Amino acid sequence: MSKTVLNAVGTPLYYSGSSTAWFSATGSGPTLHGTAGNDSMWGDSSVNVTMIGGRGDDIYYLYSSINRAYEAAGEGVDTISTWMSYTLPANFENLTVTGSGRFAFGNEADNIIKGGSGTQTIDGRGGNDVLIGAGGADTFVFARGNGSDLITDFNYDDIVRLDGYGFTSFEQILSNVAQEGADLRLHLADGESLVFANTTADELQAHQFRLSLDRSVLSQTFSDEFNTLQLRNGTSGVWDAKFWWAPEKGATLSSNGEQQWYINPSYEPTASVNPFSVNNGVLTITAAPASEAIQAEINGYDYTSGMLTTYSSFAQTYGYFEMRADMPDDQGVWPAFWLLPADGSWPPELDVVEMRGQDSNTVIATVHSNETGSRTSIENSVKVADASGFHTYGVLWTEEEIVWYFDDAAIARADTPSDMHDPMYMLVNLAVGGIAGTPRDGLADGSEMKIDYIKAYSLDADWQI
């Protein structure tokens, strides 16, 4: 009989049974079939193959993105095991991801999701799932509407990320837990709950929880909902379309390995390729290949794009800074929303969000500092289940701590460096190259970053993080 584990609602979830047949993709054709029994199907990183176990409990070992697994509905309890970041397809029950720094995301069914000895981000998504960290400092993600889950091995270094449940303080967490024998149940909302196996309330720590943004302590100080684009013109307008130090023709950041030139629409020789457009309250920044005529004006760079700053119009010390945007998913593009010191110095720098177009499941949140006398950076590469479409990206900057948010849910924290206590202004841009690499297709169809709004808030004087 197959091994089982009870989930948070008392339903037994099954592990795949022991295999009775074994198959390898090495030397196979494009399709590899199993038997009607329990199969182990081994991929090969050099073989482009779809493996089909068929009936029975099948276990698939995937070694690269060209190894694929397929199961029809009702064909046993099936498991995928891989070192890669992976989202479980339909008709699979269980997933193991062993690679450190990877994510393991479930599907809409009741899943058993397991990590490895390193650090993983584990999100069962829909269904009532059983989650197993299996060592390392893991992040467990729970979003409202995705059911009730159980963590079998929550430890001191693990993190729980709660999205949409309205918890804004650790005290609220403690007031909603109840001991059930050896287990601790956290009551969430709408009948959903999270169970910590073999845990008591006094073992929970505030640092283990990433909670929702408390908007009641915020007072709006800046807002642009982009019904029009208010470019600076003398002493009026909001946005500069170039760095404060750049000439009228614009510039780029060559030290970042960027392959685009940021076009200043007010510079006549390149005004024909204005990267900014506004439609229905959404600002679009477009990156595109540069024609030979334009290249002659922009130092030979291959691409054009746009950047905006509030250097001339707005800066603030501490507060909450937020952008709602639809990020591009094209290979080789690098969208960002960030803060720089109003006095023109660098570092420090506070990156609210950066992304690589080809990696839409990773939100990069970074703080740069010179507090030690040399440049240091704390980078958080946060795994999210779905960053397609519009989402909010924010950072809460206080005297003691910096907290990053994705859709109002905290995703990362860092201490505020000693050189980050002066006013900073906002920047938003769409770069090409740099950390995202070279576009695979030369951006033949262009790439678009769409921004619904950018806002800033101050904090109530008596509020503490």
From Swiss-Prot:
What PROSITE patterns does the record tag this protein with?
A: GH16_2
What EC designation does it have?
Answer: 3.2.1.-
Pathway it belongs to? Glycan metabolism; exopolysaccharide biosynthesis
The leader peptide range reads none
Indicate the enzyme's highest-level EC class.
Answer: hydrolase
Principal location class: secreted
Gene Ontology cellular-component terms for this entry are: extracellular region
Keyword Chaperone annotated:
no
* InterPro entries (alphabetical): ConA-like_dom_sf, GH16, Glycosyl_Hydrlase_16, Hemolysn_Ca-bd, Serralysin-like_metalloprot_C
Hemolysin-type calcium-binding repeats, residue ranges: 33-50, 105-122, 123-140
Key words, A-Z: Exopolysaccharide synthesis, Glycosidase, Hydrolase, Plasmid, Repeat, Secreted
Entry's localization field: Secreted
One GO MF annotation is: calcium ion binding
GO terms, biological process? polysaccharide biosynthetic process
Q: Which SUPFAM superfamilies match?
A: beta-Roll, Concanavalin A-like lectins/glucanases
Top-rank lineage group of the source organism? Bacteria
GH16 domain residues are 206-462
Where in the sequence is the active site? E349 (nucleophile), E354 (proton donor)
One matching Pfam family is Glyco_hydro_16
Q: Does the keyword Transport apply?
A: no
| Similarity remark | Belongs to the glycosyl hydrolase 16 family.
**Summary of the function given for this chain in its UniProt record:** Cleaves high molecular weight succinoglycan to yield LMW succinoglycan. Dynamically regulates the molecular weight distribution of succinoglycan by cleaving nascent succinoglycan only during a limited period after its synthesis, perhaps before it undergoes a time-dependent change in its conformation or aggregation state.
Protein name according to UniProt: Endo-1,3-1,4-beta-glycanase ExsH
Q: Which organism is it from?
A: Rhizobium meliloti (strain 1021) (Ensifer meliloti)
Name the gene that codes for it. exsH
